[in-house]
């Protein structure tokens, strides 16, 4: 099966009531781990790369790694997604490099640091939608800024994240604005701000509704029942992996991620894409530290890279099962980008709100 657009997977997930983890990648071992887990669980795959990941791996290397995954696992539908595009040009370059889905994050200006106005966000996102949909490529937008409801601070990821602190009005997606944004931009998926942030240090305590607003997802889904919602910064930060890292020389302080059961609540309320990166980074780091500590004379990189694949594969397989993704890859049929482009042109995939549907 060739690379497929994100919309194909999210539509299937919505029809069948499950979510799909979207795993960030920048090297061979990560891609191998994800695809091994997907094959093990019969799960569709969303691979995503940030601007930093594309620079690190190199465009040609990354593109061919993804094509190798498609060739090796022809039975698995795979999406290649641009994560947090800071400007239309970033999204267009991703499309030129065979990405089948892009995120135009207009919640921040092009410097990826300054919170943007609603009007700016709508304009740049709509610009990308017009170009991408003409090619059958899916588009994710974002409304609200990712950051902590405890501190008001964000966590930059590959240079993407606001500086300073924001208030709750900026850190929580407004349901009314969400309706206006989706109708004005026609995005395929909407990333919402509910108190999650990038990195391992998301919460200082086990999150409750006060600092993790799953109820905001429920309200947005009520207003936009046919819009695919996205949770960013949704690693669960497993305690056992942190303990293993620290056992072998790490110094990660106590921290809390997004509990799986809270993500499952979100999936029941329209969340179809769940972004995960930190959990896999922790798995790789734990494996490498353990392997090096147990055999300090070893200098063959394969000695510690092989365990990193195994540890990350375990995390990915667990998320596929926990989110209900498992068992669905074989049920999804190939649909070309050209077919999706025709559907967009005919208005068959237009986004509408619950209120508009009643008119």
Swiss-Prot record:
Instruction: Provide the family line.
Output: Belongs to the class II fructose-bisphosphate aldolase family.
Checking Pfam families in the record gives: F_bP_aldolase
Chain positions recorded as dihydroxyacetone phosphate binding sites: 199, 233-235, 275-278
Task: Provide the organism lineage as a comma list.
Answer: Bacteria, Bacillati, Cyanobacteriota, Cyanophyceae, Nostocales
Q: Which residues form the signal peptide?
A: none
Locate the residues binding Zn(2+) 1: 84, 198, 232
**Name of this chain's protein:** Fructose-bisphosphate aldolase
List of residues binding D-glyceraldehyde 3-phosphate:
50
Q: Which reaction does it catalyse?
A: beta-D-fructose 1,6-bisphosphate = D-glyceraldehyde 3-phosphate + dihydroxyacetone phosphate
Note describing how the cofactor binds: Binds 2 Zn(2+) ions per subunit. One is catalytic and the other provides a structural contribution.
Origin: domain of life: Bacteria
An individual GO BP term: glycolytic process
The source organism is Nostoc sp. (strain PCC 7120 / SAG 25.82 / UTEX 2576)
Q: Per its Swiss-Prot or TrEMBL entry, what cofactor is needed?
A: Zn(2+)
State any single GO MF term. Answer: fructose-bisphosphate aldolase activity
């Amino acid at each position: 099966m060739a690379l497929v657009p994100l919309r194909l997977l999210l539509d299937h997930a919505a029809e069948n009531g499950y979510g799909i983890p979207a795993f960030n990648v920048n090297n061979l071992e990560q891609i191998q781990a994800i695809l091994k887990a997907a094959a093990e669980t019969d799960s569709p795959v969303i691979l995503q790369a940030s601007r930093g990941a594309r620079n690190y791996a190199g465009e040609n290397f990354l593109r061919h790694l993804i094509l190798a995954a498609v060739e090796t696992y022809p039975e698995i539908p795979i999406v290649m997604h641009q994560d947090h595009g800071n400007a239309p040009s970033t999204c267009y370059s991703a499309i030129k490099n065979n990405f089948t889905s892009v995120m135009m994050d207009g919640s921040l200006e092009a410097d990826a640091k300054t919170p943007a106005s609603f009007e700016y966000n709508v304009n740049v996102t709509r610009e990308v939608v017009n170009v991408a949909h003409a090619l059958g490529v899916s588009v994710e937008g974002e409304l609200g800024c990712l950051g902590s409801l405890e501190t008001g601070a964000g966590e930059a990821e590959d240079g993407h994240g606001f500086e300073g602190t924001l208030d709750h009005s900026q850190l929580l997606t407004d349901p009314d604005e969400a309706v206006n944004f989706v109708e004005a931009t026609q995005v395929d998926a909407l990333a919402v701000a509910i108190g999650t942030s990038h990195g391992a240090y998301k919460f200082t305590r086990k999150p409750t509704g006060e600092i993790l607003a799953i109820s905001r997802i429920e309200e947005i889904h009520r207003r936009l029942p046919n819009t695919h919602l996205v949770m960013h910064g949704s690693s669960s930060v497993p305690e056992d992996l942190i303990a293993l890292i620290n056992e072998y020389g790490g110094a990660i302080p106590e921290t809390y991620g997004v509990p799986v059961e809270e993500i499952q609540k979100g999936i029941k309320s329209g969340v179809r894409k769940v972004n995960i990166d930190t959990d896999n980074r922790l798995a790789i780091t734990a494996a490498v530290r353990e392997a090096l500590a147990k055999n300090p004379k070893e200098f063959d990189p394969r000695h510690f890279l092989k365990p990193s694949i195994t540890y990350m594969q375990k995390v990915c397989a667990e998320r596929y099962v926990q989110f209900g993704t498992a068992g669905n890859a074989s049920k999804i049929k190939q649909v070309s980008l050209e077919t999706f482009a025709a559907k967009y042109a005919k208005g068959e995939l237009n986004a509408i709100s619950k209120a508009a549907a009643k008119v």
